[in-house]
Amino acid sequence: MRSTQKYYEADAYRTEAAGRILAAEPDGCGGGKIALDGTVFYPEGGGQPADRGTLTLPDGTVLHVTDVHEQGGVIWHATDALPEAAAPGTEVQEALDWAWRFDKMQQHTGEHILSGILHQMFGAENVGFHIGTDAVRMDTSVPISAEGLREAELAANRIVWQNVPVCITYPTREELAALTYRSKKEIEGQVRIVSIPGADVCACCGTHTAATGAVGQIKILAAENYKGGVRLSIVCGERALLAAQAMRQRQADIGALLSAKPSETAHAVHRVFDEYTALKFAHFGLCSRLFEALAAQTAPGEDAIRIVPGLDPDGLHRLAVKLSEATTGLCAALTANEKGTGYCLARADGDVRALTKALNAALNGRGGGKPGICQGSCAAAPEQVERFLKENHIL
């Protein structure tokens, strides 16, 4: 079977073409895959997802292209159906989902610009790249500071604003040997070079905008340390605008909650955090006084089962420990929670693991710990747990 002619390489803005079926195979699930002699559909590869769109048969039947892959120079189009009319030799009309394609062009060209700038500024190699549904993932070979990323983001957007042409060339082996360009792997055969003046020269098989202005904007959403470098999450074009709108709305929502202007939300959050910290320390102190009072009411040797509303796991643990300092009997701190009851069992110089296991089995609980103290929760009311412990405390 002869190779498929790649119309998208010569013109990334071409959205329609007539193609002839070279081969068609069913997929066993009601759909199939169709090889064409020429295509406007980009096959998945190089970090860029496959194009989507339709193939229309001579009888008007429309097949939806859901995936595209290249195998041995032949490009196969996965379709949602494969009627008998889709036979070798049949001519079909190809039509791209342009919104899908143009988004990938914006993301891919934006990634090239930012990768080239990061390489210029920090010597960073792009060691990983994928255009995802929500964002583009980029992995760099070296760590880059937050300030460095801000500077690179600004420099990349300046290239966008200059609206310089994105040039596609196919240099000879001699020309290629004299050319400095980025490439993540050795390439056999003809090398396709994508050049962006002032930003990048890179070997690439993907689709790109004709000029950088069409990228619109490049925005870094997140950065994290990853394998000695940085993993970036970026968006370009319409995605960047939508991300900015979403961030602005979140800021407005936070401002409304805190009665603060959008420009003052950070200060307002710090204020609320300081207030929360003060209340947390005050609550800790009040709980300590309560736990001491409950322990003081406990006679040496007696069991101490206390139900206290609103305790978190740390509070349960602190109360159980405080009670066990006052008595050698069974000590239990209980509180109602969303699962039923949170508990912490303790016994000075004793072992509460068997009792904990029995409690979990009887009341659909989960938890465990060390011989002297165990903690968990169960699907029962605190009063049910209290009754079980009183009836089984000798375990």
Residues covered by each model-derived region:
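A glycine- and charged-residue-rich anion-binding loop/surface
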Residues: 1-395
